[in-house]
UniProtKB/Swiss-Prot annotation:
<keyword id="KW-0547">Nucleotide-binding</keyword>
<dbReference type="Pfam" id="PF00005">
    <property type="entry name" value="ABC_tran"/>
</dbReference>
<feature type="domain" description="ABC transporter">
    <location>
        <begin position="17"/>
        <end position="258"/>
    </location>
</feature>
<keyword id="KW-1278">Translocase</keyword>
<comment type="similarity">
    <text>Belongs to the ABC transporter superfamily. Phosphate importer (TC 3.A.1.7) family.</text>
</comment>
<dbReference type="InterPro" id="IPR017871">
    <property type="entry name" value="ABC_transporter-like_CS"/>
</dbReference>
<keyword id="KW-0592">Phosphate transport</keyword>
<keyword id="KW-0472">Membrane</keyword>
<dbReference type="InterPro" id="IPR027417">
    <property type="entry name" value="P-loop_NTPase"/>
</dbReference>
<comment type="subunit">
    <text>The complex is composed of two ATP-binding proteins (PstB), two transmembrane proteins (PstC and PstA) and a solute-binding protein (PstS).</text>
</comment>
<protein>
    <recommendedName>
        <fullName>Phosphate import ATP-binding protein PstB</fullName>
        <ecNumber>7.3.2.1</ecNumber>
    </recommendedName>
</protein>
<dbReference type="InterPro" id="IPR005670">
    <property type="entry name" value="PstB-like"/>
</dbReference>
<dbReference type="GO" id="GO:0015415">
    <property type="term" value="F:ATPase-coupled phosphate ion transmembrane transporter activity"/>
</dbReference>
<dbReference type="InterPro" id="IPR003593">
    <property type="entry name" value="AAA+_ATPase"/>
</dbReference>
<dbReference type="GO" id="GO:0035435">
    <property type="term" value="P:phosphate ion transmembrane transport"/>
</dbReference>
<keyword id="KW-1003">Cell membrane</keyword>
<dbReference type="GO" id="GO:0005886">
    <property type="term" value="C:plasma membrane"/>
</dbReference>
Length: 263
């Protein structure tokens, strides 16, 4: 399958993140190639594409997860609120507070449900006990988990089901009140019922947050997102409103992937 590079010129009304000519390298391997797109504010944007296409790599550039590894580097611009995150001197912990992340596998901390939520908050704010109690309840309620755990807040997060653990991780992420929430295949390890709850939660979260989700599940992208980006071999092939991408894609490569003729 031969593809040629294309210019993606889709302007969104209120971009929260503006990516321009982004290139990313794992050592000498060129993983992302001249990516340019705008992530709309308080909308859900989905990244789709086959394994190894670069969608998770792109997601992780938004909060500089690659900074943990010296051999990895990004070039270009990722602008948020008028500041290029790639050259910004913003404290990395502060950046990750503004741009939260939930990973593919639920990763609760080895502590109580309450402390899972309170831990990150304590890094950035000094709250009284009653204020912290309110924040914990608020975050767990936002993550549609409060009703299930309110009577066992001091039990280990490890005692929750997989779907509950993932919602706990989402609650932990929003407890520090980020502006952007990154979800890297958050439902891939979950059963259909838990997946449905996460999808309902995503729909509610966009009222307050800019949400970006990586998913292998095209039906999930169609259900959950407002905008969709299709990637292949480190290139952005097509980006636009989800309904248009799935009903009338502009690129044959996108149509082939969505219809299952390629993938």
């Amino acid at each position: 399958m031969t593809m040629t590079a294309t210019s993606i010129d889709v302007r969104v009304q209120s971009p929260k993140i503006d990516v321009r000519d982004l290139n990313f390298y794992y050592g000498k391997f060129h993983a992302l190639k001249n990516i340019s797109l705008q992530i709309p504010e308080k909308q859900v944007t989905a990244f789709i594409g086959p394994s190894g296409c670069g969608k998770s790599t792109l997601l992780r550039t938004f909060n500089k997860m690659y900074a943990l590894y010296p051999e990895q580097r990004a070039e270009g611009e990722i602008n948020m609120d008028g500041e290029n995150l790639l050259t910004s001197r913003m404290d990395i912990a502060l950046l990750r507070a503004k741009v939260g992340m939930v990973f593919q596998k639920p990763t609760p901390f080895p502590m109580s449900i309450y402390d899972n939520i309170a831990f990150g908050v304590k890094l950035f704010e000094r709250l009284s006990r009653s204020e912290m109690d309110d924040r914990v309840e608020w975050a767990l309620t936002k993550a549609a988990l409060w009703g299930e755990v309110k009577d066992k807040l001091h039990q280990s997060g490890y005692g929750l089901s997989g779907g509950q653990q993932q919602r706990l991780c989402i609650a932990r992420g929003i407890a520090i009140r980020p502006e952007v929430l990154l979800l890297d295949e958050p439902c891939s390890a979950l059963d259909p019922i838990s997946t449905g709850k996460i999808e309902e939660l995503i729909a509610e979260l966009k009222d307050d947050y800019t949400v970006v989700i990586v998913t292998h599940n095209m039906q999930q992208a169609a259900r959950c997102s407002d905008y969709t980006a299709y990637m292949y071999l480190g290139e952005l092939i097509e980006f636009g409103e989800t309904e248009k991408i799935f009903i009338k894609p502009r690129r044959k490569e996108t149509e082939d992937y969505i219809t299952g003729r390629f993938g």
